[in-house]
Amino acid sequence: MDKFLECYHGTSKENAEKILSTRTYKESGQDEWLGRGVYFFENDPRQAHKFVKVYKKLSDVDVRVLFTKLCVMEDKNMLDLMTDEDRDFIEDYERRLRAKIKRTLSPHNIYWKHKEGYVLDFLFEKNPYALVRAAYDIPKRPRTEGFGYAQVQIQVCVKQPSCIMQGTIKYHTAPIER
């Protein structure tokens, strides 16, 4: 069965207009935590807004959040780092690649900071998959005393742009609490 995700992408006003007119997102570089691809926050427009505001140093007036549906077709693979099975798989894959990686990269390479991104890119080159989904701690957001849940955001990195349902790309217009 196909899997659908409702996602949000934060960007500048200028980039949002380009995305809406071309129905195309720009892929990130290779030095990102989930590797090369187009990044989204799953079900969380507020995190998309906060992230781009801090990361790109934009004012609230210059930030735009786009809503987009993603579809992973039944015959495509999705790597879900929210599950033990997929986390175990990627960690084992990294262990098997480690010697090759150490021979290839200097100890000062950014790989050692965003190891999963490089491993995910190596994996994609050998065995393409549609997207990867992972939970990360929300920066500067400690757990609330007495509450057991983790303060996390779900990030999605699309590796195959065909997952992006171009007809669903639109501005997120609901107010975002800041």
What are these regions (language model features)?
Residues 64-178:
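Active-site and NAD+-binding cores of ADP-ribose-processing enzymes
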Residues 28-55:
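Extended catalytic/binding region for NAD+/ADP-ribose chemistry, centered on the ART fold
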Residues 1, 29-32, 57-59, 144-148:
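A general structural signal for short secondary-structure junctions and capping/turn motifs
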Residues 8-14, 38-45, 70-74:
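Short, flexible loop/turn elements at secondary-structure junctions
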Residues 26-27, 55-67:
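Cytochrome P450 catalytic domain signature, combining two hallmark sequence patches
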Residues 1-33:
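ADP-ribose/NAD+-binding catalytic cleft of ART/PARP-like enzymes
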Residues 5, 35-38, 63-67:
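Extracellular structured ligand-interaction cores
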Residues 48-50, 60, 77-80:
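Short, solvent-exposed secondary-structure capping/transition elements
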